[in-house]
A protein has these predicted regions:
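Phosphate-binding beta-alpha-beta segment of Rossmann-like dinucleotide-binding domains, i.e.
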Residues: 1-29, 41
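NAD(P)-binding Rossmann-fold cofactor-contacting core
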Residues: 49-65
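Rossmann-like adenosine-cofactor binding region
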Residues: 60-155
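Glycine-rich Rossmann-fold phosphate-binding loop(s) that bind the pyrophosphate
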Residues: 35-36
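Adenosine-phosphate binding glycine-rich loop
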Residues: 160-180
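Conserved small/polar residues in nucleotide/adenosyl-binding loops
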Residues: 185-194
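Aromatic pocket-lining residues of Rossmann-like dinucleotide-binding sites
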Residues: 46
Length: 197
């Protein structure tokens, strides 16, 4: 949204350079696929930044307070053209494998941003590259890819409008996560093992 990755690239050249307009979460529409721990936390933050948040679930009808609207996955294609940002936080299953292929990306809003912190198998990486290259998508942020690890010569690495992290965006790199894991293994009491949040 703020082009920070591009400004980092320009910084290396030593140039003071304005890269033009940026986008804001305010008044945008964010579609969050999967409302588990990761999706729920992402949705809360998007809403706090002023976005209209649409949650997508396979099951369940109880709408959490942190989403403005809750839909089932069978209505996904109807809502894709509205979304400025699509955040995928789904697990990798036979039902989600290849869910975001070229056909589905074509249904997305022109200039949308695609985020994938779920599993790489959900997004067709070659279709993603094509959508980024032809301008269908304004950008992508992926913490997971297919294949994973992404080969060094894969074209996604060279996409200026993509940010790639090597499956590290989860909480496993936080000290508090390590502390909780240690507590699980060292505590004699099951009650102490859950005393982390």
């Amino acid at each position: 949204l703020k082009k920070l990755h591009l400004y980092r690239d320009v910084q290396r050249t030593g140039k003071w350079c304005d890269l033009g307009q940026v986008r804001s979460a305010w008044n945008s529409t964010v579609l969050v696929l999967g409302l588990g721990d990761i999706g729920g936390e992402f949705a809360k933050r998007a809403k706090a930044l002023g976005a209209r948040v649409i949650g997508v679930r396979r099951t369940g009808t109880d709408k959490p307070d942190f989403v403005d609207e809750l839909i089932h996955t069978d209505k996904l294609d109807e809502y894709l053209p509205q979304a400025d940002c699509v955040a995928i936080t789904l697990p990798g299953t036979t039902a989600t494998k290849g869910m975001f292929d070229a056909e589905r990306m074509a249904k997305m809003k022109d200039g949308a941003i695609l985020l994938n912190v779920g599993r790489g198998m959900i997004v067709d990486t070659d279709a993603l590259c094509a959508a980024l290259e032809n301008g269908k998508l304004a950008g992508a942020g992926v913490d997971v890819t297919d294949p994973e690890p992404l080969p060094a010569d894969h074209p996604l690495w060279k996409m200026e409008n993509a940010v790639i992290t090597p499956h590290i965006s989860g909480g496993y790199h936080l000290q508090e996560t390590h502390d909780r894991i240690c507590l699980l293994y060292t505590s004699p009491s099951p009650r102490d093992r859950t005393r982390s949040r």
